[in-house]
Amino acid sequence: MKLLKIIGIPMLAVCVLGMTGCSSMNNTGKGALIGGGNGAAIGAATAATIDTAAVRDSISAIISGMPGEIGVAAIIDSRDTVTVNDIDKYALMSVFKMHQAIAVCHSFDLKGIPLDTILEFDRTSLNPDTWSPMLKEHQDAHFRMPVSELLRYTLMQSDNNASNLMFDRLVSVAETDSLIATLIPRNCFRITERESDMQSDHAKSYNNHSSPSGVARLVERLFTDSILSTEKQEFICETMRGCHTGADRIAAPLAGKDGITIAHKTGSGYINETGILTAYTDAAYITLPDGTSYTLVILVKDFAGNEKQASDIMARISDTVYRAITRNKPNN
């Protein structure tokens, strides 16, 4: 193993992929997002596998009249696409840790650094007043931890200290933002804040934002394209399959169903002074027993309700998409 005591890594060398804005998918023939507005759906040139318009209408009916803004994007088998309320900027919250993991792995790929490289840091450099399973599980004054373990803490348990540490010591917020802009359209997202920045000023949570389709594009590329070395890309995907958070959101209606795998990353916002839940998010890649796969992203913004109510809405949307996909399949 290598011992890593670096303070920073130079700006990532990136190759711009020439992707267009949020209103159109890439030119690989994997479908298109047309319009965006309050709901757009279109399949690929081949016959659609589901009635995308009906799915869009069903989702719109679920979120109609809800006390907040709810945006949805679904991509089925890299082809059929449904979006609802895709035009706004939704706070990502900890969903951005998926973006961060991609940037860290990309940087390590460029430098030929393995993920079992050891990072050393002191307990005094960590925040005891933030969400951090890592800090609770390790009581030592001095830490020696492989970067792979830091990534597991961020992706599986959404650890804020692990995320802050990697931004400060490995790949900065600005570098992460720049790298992701080579993978999805620039106007779909922005990442400018660490967890520590948002904790000190909750209003900064809105600065890390995305459209639902922006997140969906990134999830889709992560699970279906080659954007990293095989080893590191598979590491992120497998780690997201072990996500411990948000079981009552997109995953809820899929629980207990044989042969379904779900990889996802969730985020939870702050409650502001007026009792509004600033954000509640989930981004998932789901594979069914017959090999059908789909990406589903649900972003909730400024919700005048509690987390359980937001989770219930997300679960209903997830169930709607699942039922539409499996309606004509046997044994579902």
What residue spans do the PLM features occupy?
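Structured C-terminal helix/loop/strand segments within mature extracytoplasmic catalytic/sensor domains
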Residues: 51-60, 168-169, 173, 221-260, ...
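Active-site SXXK
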Residues: 91-121, 154, 296
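C-terminal motif of bacterial Sec signal peptides marking the signal peptidase cleavage site
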Residues: 17-21
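Short, well-structured active-site flanking segments
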Residues: 106-126, 173-177, 229-233
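Mid-domain, small-residue-enriched loop/turn segments at the edges of structured enzyme/sensor domains
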Residues: 69, 143, 164-227
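Conserved catalytic neighborhood of penicillin-recognizing serine enzymes
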Residues: 126-164
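Short, low-complexity, glycine-enriched hydrophobic/amphipathic alpha-helices that associate
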Residues: 23-53
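Beta-lactamase-like hydrolase cores
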Residues: 48-89, 270
